[in-house]
Amino acid sequence: MGKKSRAVPGRRPILQLSPPGPRGSTPGRDPEPEPDTEPDSTAAVPSQPAPSAATTTTTAVTAAAASDDSPSEDEQEAVQEVPRVVQNPPKPVMTTRPTAVKATGGLCLLGAYADSDDDDNDVSEKLAQSKETNGNQSTDIDSTLANFLAEIDAITAPQPAAPVGASAPPPTPPRPEPKEAATSTLSSSTSNGTDSTQTSGWQYDTQCSLAGVGIEMGDWQEVWDENTGCYYYWNTQTNEVTWELPQYLATQVQGLQHYQPSSVPGAETSFVVNTDIYSKEKTISVSSSKSGPVIAKREVKKEVNEGIQALSNSEEEKKGVAASLLAPLLPEGIKEEEERWRRKVICKEEPVSEVKETSTTVEEATTIVKPQEIMLDNIEDPSQEDLCSVVQSGESEEEEEQDTLELELVLERKKAELRALEEGDGSVSGSSPRSDISQPASQDGMRRLMSKRGKWKMFVRATSPESTSRSSSKTGRDTPENGETAIGAENSEKIDENSDKEMEVEESPEKIKVQTTPKVEEEQDLKFQIGELANTLTSKFEFLGINRQSISNFHVLLLQTETRIADWREGALNGNYLKRKLQDAAEQLKQYEINATPKGWSCHWDRDHRRYFYVNEQSGESQWEFPDGEEEEEESQAQENRDETLAKQTLKDKTGTDSNSTESSETSTGSLCKESFSGQVSSSSLMPLTPFWTLLQSNVPVLQPPLPLEMPPPPPPPPESPPPPPPPPPPAEDGEIQEVEMEDEGSEEPPAPGTEEDTPLKPSAQTTVVTSQSSVDSTISSSSSTKGIKRKATEISTAVVQRSATIGSSPVLYSQSAIATGHQAAGIGNQATGIGHQTIPVSLPAAGMGHQARGMSLQSNYLGLAAAPAIMSYAECSVPIGVTAPSLQPVQARGAVPTATIIEPPPPPPPPPPPPPPAPKMPPPEKTKKGRKDKAKKSKTKMPSLVKKWQSIQRELDEEDNSSSSEEDRESTAQKRIEEWKQQQLVSGMAERNANFEALPEDWRARLKRRKMAPNT
């Protein structure tokens, strides 16, 4: 009888917090705990001695009641179910002691619900128990079950049963059709506690899967029905389909139930969870667990959570489920700490707890989870798993195996947590107060919750596939069935934020259970999918030759920053994480600035002008140009002065653009150049880099550190020696030039410190020719005549002059100033100042593009991608004004001559870019060659062989880029051209006759129709 009684208890519909004892086959149906008001499980047991199942149920109810003090509706419901379950009265195996109830303890625990409904359930359970005791007639059970199921349906959206990976019954599976539900509930209840004699009236809860029960299926196959949330059985031979368990299988199931209550197909036993621990703290709760053979498996789902948490019990609320469950296992010190923590958390969480009685405290929940884990260990893990599988037959046997594995994992995790708890580290399990601050980190919280749920998943695991899929949604909010689960997730999130544990405890038992398994599965599935997609994409990129080696670290930083900001705006990224990453990026740039700045100089950011300026630490003088440390000071100073003047002028023309580009380019390029050429190349490379850097660094524009107002001297006034920047060239020309410049530079990356100079210069020459020829040619040709001379002079004097060649109509010597300003300024300045000065209105948009292009080109150069295009745009844009600046900048970096380009060519830097400015239609190759030779000499002295290799590769890449600029460049160029064309049309008055500028008349549709008809006629 012991076995039988065990099975019977397992059968009990009540999923109250039963002692950890194995619960026979508690129907997974009784989700609602049946804590009775009865204080002692013992009392309950005696009252139900006739049918041990009834007794068990009563005991469970009593225990629950005791813990709850007032029976909850759920409990009452559970009680009602009990009669159904207790059709065959087993001996009152349930001792008052939780241990006695062990058979159903786990299930009861899981089933125990902390809802106000529990009390009602208790009452109904008691009634049901009395009925069971009297006759336990199948009819009574049927009617009770029907009522119970109806109640459950009303109370909770049906939750598909998932195999209880851990001994917790799955959340209520979706209700099968009313008839089926009633019968299945009956059957499960009966099966748990039925005697073999009851076979006639015995019914199996079809919501529970037979997988894992270990019965021979023969010709029958179990099929899950999503609509009803139940399984139906299909005879593969006869093609017969039945909602009820076929006799062939029913006989086996009944036999199993009697012999292995814990593995009862009802899997109700899984509810037995850790009732013992629970019972110790709450004897009543434990008792309810014992009586845990809640019949209604659906309720069981709820009950499982409730039972597990039985948080509704006032005692638990005071004490905490964790305390109740773990009391026997945990040392006093830990208990006290938990108690203190719980009190703290409860105050904060009470509203949340109210939201979900089930989750009295997250801490409790966590603790409960641990006890459950322990209980699972105490209880028969295999049996629990079997029960879970049975109860949660919503999943295939395969899944059940997974559940078993998961259960084991969960148990392991819980054990570890328990150990940590014992060590006093409550935070591990999460029972310790969680950072209430984690709300912003709700994602982290969710992750933690999910992990916790993973633990709970043991119990929830059995949810039917449907429920699993639903639960899989992180919060389960997506599905009504998971209503509870969703709430649990939500609550758990809140709790996580407030006190991970408290909410989780109550709420998570049921909801988390349901969701945990699905979530764990979902997480694993998600991880798998992510890994698959990531591997595929990575492999494709690799095959296509797209790798990080082709771009600089700063490019990566820029893209990462942009992506993170976009994700953050979408709410998919933690703000604190983003802030930390942005700070890291800012720090990287800061290091770059420090390394790039020549000795004796400090680099500062001017927020107003959005560009760098440099302060001589000895003299305290400040300047926009990048100081050329390697060039002779005089040369560098002269160039810097000129550059400064030009830059300032250009800045005046378009301060905003210049500052933006200067900032980023100077920061990124300046430092790079400085590093490699100790400031020689800094201007040139910085300038090209600037535009892109601005974006990449996002630090500069987005996170630019405020310019130290007092420490750095104010940016130097633009020197007056350099001629004022020529008026902006015609918008079309300017736009084109800028576009070209931007395109080329945008595609390039800042060259490596060693190679920066050469690469930018060479690519710029090539690029300049190509791109500048395209759009700049017209403008350059016009400006080249005027600036050609200047450029020639500069080129001759400084290879840089070539760049300053007159790409823009007006030569912008801003190169030096822009360069000095900072490569960001230079970068932006190149386009903005070089071209921008020429065409300030057009240059602003173009400048922005140019910056990107330039940055890109520098980057490409740096990465070996599109150095040439960047340089080209560089040369083009700055040819008139900017050429000097661009070429000067690169040269400056190398020779610090750029400023001289337009105004007074300083001594030609050894590595001036060989390519003539595109606008001038390429200065004589001789000059370029000379410049290149100079550069080569410098590079030889400055650069290692690797750098040379890199530079040669860059040149090749630049040539390629020249032929086809990057998409970005193309887009920006096209946009610029359109804008320039619009400006031209408007300025020239052509717009009046251009239909593109006409406002669409209201009858435009009719007009369009007429037009279409005209050609036909």
From Swiss-Prot:
Composition skew (Acidic residues), residue ranges: 627-637, 733-748, 957-970
Top-level taxonomic group: Eukaryota
Compositional bias of kind Basic and acidic residues: 491-513, 640-656, 971-982
InterPro entries listed in its UniProt record: WW_dom, WW_dom_sf, WW_domain_protein
Covalent link (Glycyl lysine isopeptide (Lys-Gly) (interchain with G-Cter in SUMO2)) residue numbers: 335, 348, 519
GO cellular component, one term: nucleoplasm
Disordered: annotated segments: 1-141, 160-202, 421-519, 621-676, 706-792, 899-994
Keyword Glycoprotein: no
Organ and tissue specificity: Highly expressed in the eye.
Annotated positions of the Phosphothreonine modification: 172, 479, 516-517
Bias type Basic residues, positions: 449-458, 929-941
Cross-link (Glycyl lysine isopeptide (Lys-Gly) (interchain with G-Cter in SUMO1)): 301, 348, 519
Gene3D superfamilies linked: 2.20.70.10
Entry-linked Pfam families: WW (PF00397)
Repeat is among the record's keywords: yes
Stretches with biased composition (Low complexity): 40-69, 181-200, 461-474, 657-671, 764-786
Pro residues bias spans: 706-732, 904-925
SMART domains tied to this protein: WW (SM00456)
Protein keywords: Acetylation, Isopeptide bond, Phosphoprotein, Repeat, Ubl conjugation
All copies of domain WW, residue ranges: 214-248, 595-629
Domain topic, free-text comment: These WW domains interact with Arg/Gly-rich-flanked Pro-rich domains found in several WW domain-binding proteins (WBPs). The N-terminal WW domain has the greater ligand-binding ability.
Subunit and partners: Binds FMN1. Interacts with the Arg/Gly-rich-flanked Pro-rich of KHDRBS1/SAM68. Arginine methylation in these regions has no effect on this binding.
Full protein name: Formin-binding protein 4
Taxon lineage: Eukaryota, Metazoa, Chordata, Craniata, Vertebrata
